[in-house]
Amino acid sequence: VEVKDIEKLITDAIELDEIHVAFDGSQCKIIAVADFLGDLSRVKKQQTIYAPLTQVINDGLIHAVSIKTFTTSVWQREKMFNLPL
């Protein structure tokens, strides 16, 4: 699995304004940016981003996932502290 594959799995399932993915062969770090995420609980945000990855995680292609979510306005303030992954 490559970064572009992970990005595609997520963006095919969810409409995001931005996505940033880092993957080292086992651990995946994801930053997802979309305004609708602001309406969800912390758990629901994680579940929303995690769900499209369930199959590759179950297949053992990804062993650990770290997810950070932001609305677009919060991302404008926070991106300097969160990039690069």
Where are these regions (language model features)?
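N-terminal, polar/charged subdomain of small-to-medium soluble alpha/beta proteins
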Residues: V1-L85
